């Protein structure tokens, strides 16, 4: 049987990220982005090998954008497209793994949409459009939350009245599960350990950030909670704050819940601390030039990250190593170094030369000779979604 092709789709409210994944090839035969959907500036960008191209699709919605994408995908796949994998942010307690898309699974995704109002409705737009355009293809949903359904109850429950959990699903769900699962499996391979008999601390650091404790291939705790706002300092998200901050701002400043939610999700984190940018690359450059806000943002980011990793270690009975992944985790030697400075009590130490080498897609071990294993592992959520989709084709 020839190698199979899976189209992976990740839909936002006005965008579609996509990748054509061939199970026998490391590089994607095709990848790209449709952005500014629903506006006169809507455009489709794609890359095939070293070639890049664009197509103006003014006013296109998700379905029309996918209809423009279809012939490009079929040409690159030589007419051999075997399935479509959709990233879905929230699966609630319904999904502990990937699921074929049908009327039942679609209804479940709709039911948990209030838990991810910024994400699930957009994911559904792409799913519904793709199912109309590709009615004969198997389509699969892969959930950010599914990997964390293995959390024990003492890790996922909030200390709030029981009825809020039983009747309204108020609990910790966690996110970035596809990435945490992929890199922990890769780390086990790199270390020569079985994935189902190894334990890892994982730091997924991008514009969104989370940590995870992975034991024997299962998530045991993670820093994000009911929503992706809980936990670490992120690009524009505050992470953990005093839960009374909402009522304090409402009483003292007269802010509405919508204003407070917007501030915590869009104006906080690295951007709020620095007053400059949510981009770690810009902040590192500004820090070099003496910018006080950028310096503070980096210090807070690294301290809070180290604190979270130390807390995650409580969920493990042994520790085989620490993994850095995501755009920041894979590319910022400074963030890795400053974070591990706070974790000396756990024995972590870096080899500066190895740490400096692991950027721009280069992974590998970066620990000092005497310290516990520390790995930079480039994530590949698209490939993991494709693998999960292929598993449901068999």
UniProtKB/Swiss-Prot annotation:
Principal EC category: transferase
Pathway membership: Metabolic intermediate biosynthesis; acetyl-CoA biosynthesis; acetyl-CoA from acetate: step 1/2
Disulfide bridge map: none
Cofactor(s) needed: Mg(2+); Mn(2+)
GO molecular function: acetate kinase activity; ATP binding; magnesium ion binding
Site feature location: Transition state stabilizer: 176, 237
Main subcellular location of this protein, as a coarse class: cytoplasm
Cofactor note: Mg(2+). Can also accept Mn(2+).
SUPFAM superfamilies registered for this protein in UniProt: Actin-like ATPase domain
InterPro entries per UniProt: Ac/propionate_kinase, Aliphatic_acid_kin_short-chain, Aliphatic_acid_kinase_CS, ATPase_NBD
A Pfam family this chain is assigned to: Acetate_kinase
NCBIfam families the UniProt entry points to: ackA (TIGR00016)
Protein purpose: Catalyzes the formation of acetyl phosphate from acetate and ATP. Can also catalyze the reverse reaction.
Identification of the protein by name: Acetate kinase
């Amino acid at each position: 049987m020839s190698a199979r092709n899976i189209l992976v789709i990740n839909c936002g409210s006005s965008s579609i990220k996509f990748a054509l994944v061939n199970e026998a090839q490391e590089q994607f035969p095709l990848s790209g982005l449709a952005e500014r959907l629903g506006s006169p500036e809507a455009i489709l960008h794609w890359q095939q090998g070293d070639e890049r191209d664009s197509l103006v699709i003014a006013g296109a919605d998700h379905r029309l954008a996918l209809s423009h994408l279809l012939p490009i995908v079929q040409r690159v796949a030589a007419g051999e497209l075997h399935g479509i994998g959709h990233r879905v942010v929230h699966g609630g307690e319904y999904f502990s793994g990937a699921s074929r898309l049908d009327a039942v699974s679609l209804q479940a995704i709709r039911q948990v949409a209030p838990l991810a109002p910024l994400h699930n409705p957009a994911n559904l737009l792409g799913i519904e459009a793709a199912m109309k355009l590709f009615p004969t293809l198997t389509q699969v949903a892969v959930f950010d939350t599914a990997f964390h359904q293995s959390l024990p109850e003492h890790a996922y429950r909030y200390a709030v009245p029981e009825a809020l959990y039983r009747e309204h699903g108020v609990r910790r769900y966690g996110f970035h599960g596809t990435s945490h699962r992929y890199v922990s499996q890769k780390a086990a391979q790199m270390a020569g350990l079985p994935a189902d008999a190894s334990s890892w601390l994982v730091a997924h650091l991008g514009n969104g950030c989370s940590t995870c404790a992975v034991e024997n291939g299962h998530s045991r705790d993670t820093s994000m909670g009911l929503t992706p706002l809980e936990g670490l300092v992120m690009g524009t998200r505050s992470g953990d704050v005093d839960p009374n901050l909402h009522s304090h701002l409402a009483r003292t400043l007269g802010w509405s819940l919508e204003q407070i939610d917007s501030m915590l999700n869009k104006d906080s984190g690295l951007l709020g601390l620095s007053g400059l940018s949510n981009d770690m690359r810009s902040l590192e450059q500004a820090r070099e030039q003496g910018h006080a806000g950028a310096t503070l943002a980096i210090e807070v980011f690294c301290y809070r990250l180290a604190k979270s990793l130390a807390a995650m270690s409580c969920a493990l009975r042994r520790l085989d190593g620490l993994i850095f992944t995501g755009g920041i985790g894979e590319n910022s030697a400074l963030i890795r170094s400053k974070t591990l400075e706070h974790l000396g009590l756990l024995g972590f130490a870096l080899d500066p030369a190895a740490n400096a080498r692991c950027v721009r897609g280069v992974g590998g071990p970066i620990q000092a000779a005497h310290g516990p294993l520390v790995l930079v592992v480039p994530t590949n959520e698209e490939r993991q979604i494709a693998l999960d989709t292929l598993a449901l084709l068999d």
